[in-house]
Amino acid sequence: MKILHTSDWHVGKVLKGRDRLEEHEAVLRSIIQIARDEDVDLVLVAGDLFETSTPSPKAQGLVMRALLALKAEHRHVVAIAGNHDNASLLDSVYRPVLGELGVHILGTPKTPDSGGTLHLETRAGERLTVAAMPFLSQRYAVRAAELLLHEHAEHALDYARRVAAIVGMLTAQFSPDSVNIVTAHATLLGGRRGGGERDVQTAFEYEVPSSIFPSTAHYAALGHLHRQQEIPAPCPAFYSGSPLAVDFGEEANEPGALIVTAAPGTRADARNVPVAGGRRLRTLRGRLDQVIDEGEQAGDAYLRVILAEQARAGLGDLVREKLPNALEVQLDDANRPRPGSHGGPDRPSRAGRTPAQLFGDYLSEQNVGDERVERMFAEFLDELTDGSPAT
């Protein structure tokens, strides 16, 4: 059987004030066409359907139409929540509504009998078992362990062991006469960041070993890291990568999806399929005349411009006049005004930095080296950005 593995759509993403909904529409059309051209039996969306936990009506409509189009022609579709998604929204609205139409949505981890392990059959009568593990926040991990594993909080396991225990429960029903798939939105040890992930939820507290996946699985379909890659594991385990570069840190990534071929008793094979529709992101560095020349040859790519020029009034406006697709203009390190200098505070250096990075800068300035403070801030930020239900 053939499986389409995609993840990290981030529909609703706004890049430096530029709406990208038209790009996402084109990207999802490309993914739908891949499903048709490859005549796949199953589509897996391994989390982060949306960019934010409060997606706009237009973003929601786009995702819903895409999922229904992927379901056409008797394909199975399984989608799980990522750390950017609102798990409650997916469970309370998308799951019952799209479930009636044959699309399987999981916002939070479920027991095997409640939809955490799906037993499906392809058009050709082949058996297919899917163990689905949505993103699990530190905060919700305790609650999930209580509900799914009947673990008491006072005997709490650490995060990685909780995730491993839940995956073990979900994959316990794998059988040798079925194609066994596990899908998860998680950070695996050894995985390479793509450049646009939410740092607080790729930190070491969230890393889990690839040994959580059993050798009885034919394939592990992963989401969260935006760079397509294989992770050494007891079974073939891949991140599909994002089909759209979501930030300038991902400009070198090639947008794509994976087509997986699997059968009982054999090792699954995965191959990349390019996804079209997204605009390229490029960083241009150099003197003003150099970056303008390069930018004029960059087509419709969105640009980040880093100038080797002395600060002067109107420089950024001049670049944007010549290069309308320049979304960010800053000076290089050698020419950037320093804090307390005549040029004022070092505002450009803050561009694109995450809250966790900015808080780390503040702690360094205050000579605070207590890791507990950073961990508490990470947990606080996690609660603010997490769409899981409160415990």
Regions flagged by a language model, labelled:
Residues 1-68, 72, 379-383, 387-391:
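N-terminal active-site segment of His-dependent metallophosphoesterases
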Residues 10, 40-58, 74-89, 188-204:
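Active-site neighborhood of divalent metal-dependent phosphoester/pyrophosphate hydrolases
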Residues 14-17, 49-66, 81-101, 106-107, ...:
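Metal-dependent catalytic neighborhoods of phosphoester/phosphodiester hydrolases
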Residues 96-203, 263, 274:
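Conserved catalytic scaffold of divalent metal-dependent phosphoesterases
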Residues 99-100, 188-266:
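Conserved beta-sheet core of the metallophosphoesterase superfamily
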